[in-house]
UniProtKB/Swiss-Prot annotation:
The keyword Membrane applies. HAMAP family: PSI_PsaJ. The gene is psaJ. This is Photosystem I reaction center subunit IX. The chain crosses the membrane at residues 7-27. One of its GO terms (biological process) is photosynthesis. Pfam families: PSI_PsaJ. The keyword GTP-binding does not apply. It is a single-pass membrane protein. May help in the organization of the PsaE and PsaF subunits.
Length: 37
């Protein structure tokens, strides 16, 4: 479990999670307010 948490805190994993969150947030905003972007 220690190695798994160390793996999750590495920079590429954090970047992938952050970009996925940002992209899904933009998609949802664009779905409800399509003319804002």
């Amino acid at each position: 479990m220690k190695y798994f948490t160390t793996y999750l805190s590495t920079a590429p994993v954090v970047a992938v999670l952050w970009f996925t969150l940002t992209a899904s947030l933009l998609i949802e905003i664009n779905r409800f307010f399509p003319d804002i972007l």
